[in-house]
């Protein structure tokens, strides 16, 4: 699966939206909204901008639209997180029986990039029905999901289920997302809180902003720059610790510090082998890491601690530690080893919304083809100059040294 943006996806051939229709209203038991979902709904309400994620998948030759629509219905109906909507402070499901998927008008070509982005964004927003979008374009199935419903791993899970359904294979079962919402929560973990306190002691009890000025004036974020590149064709032993130590080395000449404190997303599906790894839903927390320029061992130690922090709800950390939050978005460094998800699927890509930003976000992904990086940062002269230096320095740091094992 390539991690990119919709604007970079080649879409050729007839275009048909697979329209999702939900009869009646959501019903049944109510479940509490998660911390991520509440924050997401508040952000969308404040900005008016939906935040969606999604993907593409190759369609086998000769599969009719009716079969594709049936596959979409079975996959969506089988994932409770995709059938739920917010109801006040709770969420409530539609049933699979309330869903029908009907192929819409066939257009000779895909909409222009801006029009397609607008179409997906219009469908993938919180409302009375789930925020989902599906369409075919030539031999590609494209889908988008309001972030309320899912995370990046969910996109990969959905691609595999759609692939199986299109080939007539039975879909695997998995624990329901809404059951995880109501599962008993353990008491605050002293070790996990201790990791956060050690991090915050270093940062002055602040969740750090990006350490270099990016030239974003005023409270409004700037239009984004999207950079997608292959860093290494043969990463060898280039683990996340090596990457972070290299990133800290690239930032050091600009920040004046060998330490690069940041926050990384960590899934909350348990350790490898836990059946929750098959659950579709937004199951991501955050962990603190202090990467040190060129120091893989120290950086790897923080990543080991991130495993300890993974199960700690972020709201618990905020209540216990009361850190100062940055004015804008929190910078983020994400790493996913996509080789662990199985054999690569045809034309599988991860895409997400393009929205204004006032910080820098890095998505590193390891595939059978190498180490890739998707970066988003503000489109300002200052940020362009900074990121030219950072990305160039990162390429030199990773390509110009012996890569030491780490986590």
Predicted regions and their residues:
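Short amphipathic alpha-helices and their capping loops
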Residues: 1-46, 69-111, 174-219
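Acyl-thioester-dependent acyl-group transfer interface
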Residues: 1-47, 51, 59, 75, ...
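Active-site-proximal acidic secondary-structure segment that organizes catalysis
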Residues: 2-5, 132-179, 383-400
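Flexible, Gly/Pro-enriched loop and linker segments at secondary-structure and domain junctions
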Residues: 28-33, 50-56, 82-87, 122-136, ...
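Acyl activation and transfer enzymes in specialized metabolism, enriched
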Residues: 59-81, 143-157, 220-259, 304-311, ...
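Non-catalytic sensory/regulatory segments that transmit input signals in bacterial signaling proteins
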Residues: 65-66, 104-109, 113-114, 121-122, ...
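Secondary-structure transition/turn motif
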Residues: 93-99, 145-148, 375-382
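Internal "kinase-insert"/substrate-recognition segments embedded within catalytic cores
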Residues: 166, 206-210, 287
């Amino acid at each position: 699966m390539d991690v990119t943006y919709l604007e970079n996806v080649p879409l050729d051939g007839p275009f048909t939206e697979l329209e999702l229709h939900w009869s009646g209203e959501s019903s049944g038991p109510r479940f509490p909204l998660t911390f991520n979902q509440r924050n997401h709904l508040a952000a969308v309400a404040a900005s008016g901008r939906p935040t969606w994620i999604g993907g593409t998948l190759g369609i086998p030759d000769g599969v009719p639209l009716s079969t594709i629509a049936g596959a979409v219905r079975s996959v969506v109906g089988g994932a409770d997180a995709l059938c739920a909507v917010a109801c006040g402070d709770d969420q409530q499901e539609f049933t699979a029986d309330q869903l029908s998927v009907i192929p819409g008008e066939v257009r000779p070509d895909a909409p222009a990039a801006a029009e397609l982005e607008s179409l997906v964004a219009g469908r993938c927003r919180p409302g009375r029905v789930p925020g989902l979008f599906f369409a075919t374009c030539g031999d590609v199935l494209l889908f988008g999901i309001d972030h309320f419903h899912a995370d990046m791993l969910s996109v990969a899970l959905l691609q595999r289920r759609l692939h199986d359904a299109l080939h007539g294979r039975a879909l695997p079962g998995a624990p329901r997302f809404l059951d995880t919402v109501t599962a008993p929560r353990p008491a605050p973990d002293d070790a996990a809180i201790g990791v956060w306190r050690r991090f915050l002691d270093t940062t002055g009890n602040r969740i750090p902003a990006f350490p270099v000025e990016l030239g974003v004036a005023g409270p409004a974020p700037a239009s984004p720059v999207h950079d997608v590149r292959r860093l290494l064709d043969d990463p060898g032993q280039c683990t996340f610790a090596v990457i972070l130590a290299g990133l800290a080395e690239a930032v050091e000449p600009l920040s004046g510090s060998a330490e690069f404190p940041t926050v990384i997303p960590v899934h909350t599906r348990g350790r490898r082998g836990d059946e929750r790894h098959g659950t579709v839903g937004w199951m991501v927390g955050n962990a603190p890491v202090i990467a040190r320029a060129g120091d893989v061992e120290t950086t790897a130690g923080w990543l080991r601690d991130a495993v300890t922090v993974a199960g700690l709800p972020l709201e618990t950390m905020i209540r216990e530690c009361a850190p100062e939050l940055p004015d804008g978005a929190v910078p983020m460094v994400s790493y996913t080893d996509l080789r662990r998800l199985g054999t690569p699927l045809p034309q599988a890509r991860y895409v997400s919304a393009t929205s204004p930003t006032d910080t820098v976000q890095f998505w590193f992904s390891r595939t059978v083809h190498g180490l890739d990086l998707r970066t988003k940062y503000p489109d300002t002269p200052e940020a362009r100059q900074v990121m030219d230096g950072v990305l160039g320095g990162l390429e030199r740091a990773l390509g110009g040294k012996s890569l030491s094992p780490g986590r």
